[in-house]
Amino acid sequence: MAIDENKQKALAAALGQIEKQFGKGSIMRLGEDRTMDVETISTGSLSLDIALGAGGLPMGRIVEIYGPESSGKTTLTLQVIAAAQRAGKTCAFIDAEHALDPVYARKLGVDIDNLLCSQPDTGEQALEICDALARSGAVDVLVVDSVAALTPKAEIEGEIGDSHMGLAARMMSQAMRKLAGNLKNSNTLLIFINQIRMKIGVMFGNPETTTGGNALKFYASVRLDIRRIGAVKEGEEVVGSETRVKVVKNKVAAPFKQAEFQILYGEGINFYGELVDLGVKHKLIEKAGAWYSYNGEKIGQGKANATNFLKENKPMADEIEKKLRDMLLNNQDSTPDFTVDDNDGGVEETNEEF
């Protein structure tokens, strides 16, 4: 016991010295950390929030969203911004691709008058802006669109055709080391949009990879693979995309789940359509033939009419959403619209035919 008491005294002295040198909170017992419950922001898709396990994207962390062209990457991040703004949070969009459409952003519910936007000239400038905003503690959500467009200064000042091996990867690696701690301290969510490239000469396995080196893969708490798997049609007219998102890495809940939802052109994620689908699946909404009803009240004939009814009756939609979140997020053994994939968390191939 005497040895234990001596150890306790030595530990207390060491902790006191560390806190004196580096400040209070620089070391603590894990159970004393009041930030253990991760705060989240909704993605705008109920099935994706449930697939993520925590109810959305985690604050104070780095998130990577990648996929092929026109798969819905920017749309998903704009929906996250809209949800964050509705919760009273401040958001910034680093538009490295110089392609953000403010009209489309407004249609998705983004308050563009209060959205901070930067169109940096170089990758270093973009990442320095991210770091400055994170250190300020005044910005809650940062989006970088995209990693592939973060061009190192040396490459911009050089000639086309010059070789710049590993420059972008080194830049990203250094930025991740600086950003990770600042994001945690300020509880800022940083979302990187990324593109897919093909590795040359891969005979077996998946040839797909993401740009910017490996650092982002390690530092990201959540990685989402988003793909277009089909079209949404009204008659012969294509009005949207059927979209599948796979959670290929998740440090805040169980990974490898997936969600499917519709992205409607000019409207964004078909949230009320998800409510109908998940409500029927989990027996909150009754379906008899083509008719849908909730608590004995008919809400529409056909999914489109039921969706429009919920859109116009927000209290009922909010009630269904709350019941689904309570049922599915508090019981992580249940799997709604998604399945578990046995992969290693990398980019994976999909053989969907459109």
From Swiss-Prot:
Keyword Hydrolase: no
Region of interest (Disordered), residue spans: 331-354
Amino acid composition bias (Acidic residues), ranges on this chain: 339-354
SUPFAM superfamilies named in the record: P-loop containing nucleoside triphosphate hydrolases, RecA protein, C-terminal domain
One of the GO BP terms on file: DNA recombination
GO MF entries: ATP binding; ATP hydrolysis activity; ATP-dependent DNA damage sensor activity; damaged DNA binding; single-stranded DNA binding
Entry annotated with the keyword Transferase: no
PANTHER family listed in its UniProt record: MITOCHONDRIAL DNA REPAIR PROTEIN RECA HOMOLOG-RELATED, RECA
Role of this protein: Can catalyze the hydrolysis of ATP in the presence of single-stranded DNA, the ATP-dependent uptake of single-stranded DNA by duplex DNA, and the ATP-dependent hybridization of homologous single-stranded DNAs. It interacts with LexA causing its activation and leading to its autocatalytic cleavage.
Name of the protein described by the UniProt record: Protein RecA
Source organism: Cronobacter sakazakii (strain ATCC BAA-894)
Gene: recA
